[in-house]
Amino acid sequence: CFMHPDQTRNTFAFKTLQYIEQSMAHWVMAAGAMPVLIPSPAGDTARGDITLADYADWLDGVVMHGGADVWPGSYGEEPLRPEWSGDRIRDEYEIALVKAFVAAGKPVLGICRGLQLINVAFGGTLYQDTSTQRPGALVHRDGQVYDQQFHTVKIEEKTRLSAILAGASS
C-alpha cells in the first residue's frame, strides 16, 4: 500500500510511505510464507538498479492486497465522481508488478483491490462504485467488521492454486 505525502499526517508528512497491512502479513505467515515488501523502483528518491523483474525472479509469488480504489483511468474510464479518483501511481506500480511476476511464470494472488487490479492488468474493467452501480451489493468498507468480512471461494481442481493450497475447497 502507498500513503502519499500529506501535510496533515502526524508522521513523515512529506514522505511517500509503502507498507504491508499487519493482518495481511499475518495471513501470509499463517500459510507458511514470508511476507516481503517490494518497494517501488520509481519516485524522486529511487536509487540502484534492482527492478521488479529481479523481485519476480527472486520471490516465489506475489499477493496483491487491498487499499484505495483502482483509478478509473487504469481501465479506460473517467471517474464518475471526483471522490472516486483511486490511486493512479499505485496502479501503475502494481500493474507493472503483476506483469513482472506473470512474465516470470510466478503465481499472483489478489485479495480485494488486488483481485480488481489483476483484472485491470489483463484488460478488464470494474464498477467504480458497486453500491450505486449494483443495487443490493454488499458493503465492504465497514471498519468495525473489516477483518470479519469473508467470501466463500471454490478452488478449481487441478489448477495451480489448488496445488499451492493442497486440497483447500473453501
Locations of regions flagged by a protein language model:
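Conserved G/P- and acidic residue-centered "switch" motifs that form tight phosphate/ATP-binding loops
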Residues: 112
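The feature captures the ABC ATPase H-loop/switch
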Residues: 115
